[in-house]
């Protein structure tokens, strides 16, 4: 008799995705981040659901309701901090996952990659709207500054901003709709993640060498299930260390002051995971130019398959490209640091140089390095 997991219509889908899935025998821990992102997403939906049970999306009571969750709700403080720091863990895993894709040429799976970029945008939108909900100073001013960027769009900009606000400023209507979108988007992300996985399983996983591994496959279970469990334990360990010891390490103290439209904080800045893009935005003196650079800094990922000129898929055997990749990582860390600094000398010029370097590396230097490496192969 055939095993039920191979015949039952629902079990069969799970079986083909997580149990009998043929996986390359040599994928490293860099391939763990997909499952970790799944865990982060489930954790965020669960903690978010319990927070939504006690939260009120009204400007008069939003801040108080978050305080109420932390003080009066049973274990409300841990749910709140798991949700806030869970977002940070989510983005750490996201950046690692995207970095892995860039390094090992995973972007050559076009559908999987493009849906991944859409997922990145959706997650960033969700995180931004979630940051507005506690209605602290940084929530309010962050929402004001970021939504205002749309006013740079010629002709329709101002109308578009007021349409998103639901009035002439960030107010009650804005908070309510942000809460609605923040609630629905994670479910859209879940659906997209399933499509992401569906397309991945059409081709099978890439591996560190970038060479076809069809001749050497092993079943996903038990080999990679146990490996994913280890990754999950480490993820939860780091998350709980953050939550239980330094819950406000990655937050902004300004957000413990209730939103006040009459008082601007000295330094308006987003959460740490947006700082690199924020630095690119600020490094261009023109408003529309800055907005375009901001969008392009993420949208540039769509171009990666077109910019791939190498005869080899992975960077494993390409030392020049490897060197440029790690310079890009250092550049992004520099941008993240600059994004959190005030707009003054020397931070302005460092930010501008790092922004130029970012686009230069991806659009010109890395494709050039690929061509050089191709020619070196002939020697």
UniProtKB/Swiss-Prot annotation:
It is a multi-pass membrane protein. One of its GO terms (cellular component) is respiratory chain complex III. It is found in: Mitochondrion inner membrane. PROSITE patterns: CYTB_CTER, CYTB_NTER. Keywords: Electron transport, Heme, Iron, Membrane, Metal-binding, Mitochondrion, Mitochondrion inner membrane, Respiratory chain, Transmembrane, Transmembrane helix, Transport, Ubiquinone. SUPFAM superfamilies: a domain/subunit of cytochrome bc1 complex (Ubiquinol-cytochrome c reductase), Transmembrane di-heme cytochromes. Heme b b562 binds at residues 83, 182. It comes from the Eukaryota. One of its GO terms (biological process) is mitochondrial electron transport, ubiquinol to cytochrome c. Disulfide bonds: none annotated. Heme b b566 binds at residues 97, 196. Heme 1 (or BL or b562) is low-potential and absorbs at about 562 nm, and heme 2 (or BH or b566) is high-potential and absorbs at about 566 nm. Component of the ubiquinol-cytochrome c reductase complex (complex III or cytochrome b-c1 complex) that is part of the mitochondrial respiratory chain. The b-c1 complex mediates electron transfer from ubiquinol to cytochrome c. Contributes to the generation of a proton gradient across the mitochondrial membrane that is then used for ATP synthesis. This is Cytochrome b. It comes from Redunca arundinum (Southern reedbuck). The lineage of its organism: Eukaryota, Metazoa, Chordata, Craniata, Vertebrata.
């Amino acid at each position: 008799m055939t095993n039920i997991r191979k015949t039952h219509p629902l079990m069969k889908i799970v079986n083909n995705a997580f149990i009998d899935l043929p996986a390359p025998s040599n994928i490293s821990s860099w391939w763990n981040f997909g499952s970790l992102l799944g865990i982060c997403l489930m954790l965020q939906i669960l903690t978010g659901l319990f927070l939504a049970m006690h939260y009120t999306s009204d400007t008069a009571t939003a801040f108080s309701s978050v305080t109420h969750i932390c003080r009066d709700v049973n274990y409300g403080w841990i749910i709140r901090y798991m949700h806030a720091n869970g977002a940070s863990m989510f983005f750490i895993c996201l950046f690692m996952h995207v970095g892995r894709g860039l390094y090992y040429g995973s972007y050559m799976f076009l559908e999987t990659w493009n849906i991944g970029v859409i997922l990145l945008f959706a997650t960033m939108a969700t995180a931004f709207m979630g940051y507005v909900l506690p209605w602290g100073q940084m929530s309010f001013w962050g929402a004001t500054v970021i939504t205002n960027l749309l006013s740079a769009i010629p002709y329709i900009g101002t109308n578009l901003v007021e349409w998103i606000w639901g009035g002439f400023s960030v107010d009650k209507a804005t908070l309510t709709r942000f809460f609605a979108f923040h609630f629905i988007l994670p479910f859209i992300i879940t659906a997209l993640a399933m499509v992401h996985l569906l397309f991945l399983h059409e081709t099978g996983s890439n591996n560190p060498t970038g060479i076809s591994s069809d001749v050497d496959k092993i079943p996903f279970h038990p080999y990679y299930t146990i490996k994913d469990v280890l990754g999950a334990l480490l993820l939860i360990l780091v998350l709980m260390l953050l939550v239980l010891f330094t819950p406000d390490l990655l937050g902004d103290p300004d957000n413990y002051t209730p939103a006040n439209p009459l008082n601007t904080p000295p330094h308006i800045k987003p959460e740490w995971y947006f700082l690199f893009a924020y630095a690119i935005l600020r490094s261009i003196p023109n408003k529309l130019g800055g907005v375009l650079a901001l969008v392009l800094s993420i949208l540039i990922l769509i171009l990666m398959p077109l910019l791939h000129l190498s005869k080899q898929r992975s960077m494993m055997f390409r030392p020049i490209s490897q060197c440029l990749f790690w310079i890009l990582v250092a550049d992004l860390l520099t941008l993240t640091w600059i994004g959190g600094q005030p707009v003054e000398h020397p931070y302005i010029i460092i930010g501008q140089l790092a922004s130029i370097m970012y686009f230069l590396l991806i659009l010109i230097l890395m494709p050039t390095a690929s061509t050089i490496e191709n020619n070196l192969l002939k020697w």
